[in-house]
Amino acid sequence: MRTILNEMFSCLNEGKEIYLPSKFWQQLNEKNIAQLEASGLHNLKRTLAKNYFTFIVGLRNDQFRHLAAEAGLRNWLELLTYFPKKEAETDLDRLQFYKLSVFTRLLWLLAERHDKHKLLNRIDEPKFGNPFPIHFRNRLISQDLANSVLELSSIMEATSLGFENKLTICELGAGYGRNAYVFMKAFPNCKYIVIDIPPALYVSQEYLARVLPERKIMRFHPFKNIGEVRDEFAAADVVFLLPHQAEQLKEKSVDLFVNISSLHEMTQAQIKQYFELINQLTRGYFYMKQWKSFTNNNDGITITEAGYPYDPAWKKLLSRTARAQPAFFEAVYKIAK
């Protein structure tokens, strides 16, 4: 692991300074690397995932209360029955584990309600990464699978994309790869490009290579010119790039660009740079899901939905409170070719 990470960091340092980790990410990177060294990739859904979009929350949390209100009384008997035994290796106490189970089931119910394409019926939560043992309606469930289906449902609602289309999808900051996994299952003919910095780029690369064995993976290469990997890139279904490498992609070649909850973790200059990159690469749609307001004390900025540097030529197709997270907004933009 260390050899690959060192190679990634070395290549990143040779690129543009604007893409180096913000102070926020420097701190988070240290935590993520420490967790990787202590617990490995095999346990990432109980460690690293909690740094991304798996929430361990109490009953008074606004998201918990929102999901509870959305569930309706008739579902509560089912929600509160057939709890699994807490595994000894789970670092949660019994009460925390039960709260997590109820919360995850509430989120799953919401995702089922908005899953018009029945993706949850045909996409399973991968066992790799050691997900929390939470079951509902005779199957293993997770927050990440539910959230990814909710996000994809919003995209399909706002756009004219079809599941059989031959698409190029690009995600900035893919976490461990939850969206890439779901989107690749939903769009059998798509190419998926992950743009990220280490250690996240390493984590998503290793995770997706394991859970998508049927797909051709182009792992990270420390290339200076994308022509060096032209043939491998053309043949690959999933590609892993550092940000400065992504600048070499063909302009207006991406049908759907995605970012989930990471733009606020950057400096203002970095946010502007990434919006320019999104505009440069995208010929279709941009989906974003972010905090409505977030103060990044490490880098000294506060950002709101209105504060992002949208290009005036972009057409807003959707902007609303995220269905599962009342503190977040989600938006879809049409980007001119």
Question: Where do the model's predicted regions map?
Answer:
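Conserved Class I S-adenosyl-L-methionine-dependent methyltransferase catalytic core
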Residues: Q27-E164
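Core SAM-dependent methyltransferase catalytic element
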Residues: P312-K337
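Conserved SAM-binding loop of SAM-dependent methyltransferases across substrates and taxa
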Residues: Y176-F187
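A short, conserved alpha-helix within the catalytic core of class I
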Residues: E265-I278
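S-adenosyl-L-methionine
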Residues: Y207-K250
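Conserved class I S-adenosyl-L-methionine
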Residues: E164-G175
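A conserved beta-strand element that flanks and buttresses the S-adenosyl-L-methionine
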Residues: V258
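Conserved beta-strand signature within the Rossmann-like core of class I S-adenosyl-L-methionine
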Residues: T282-S293
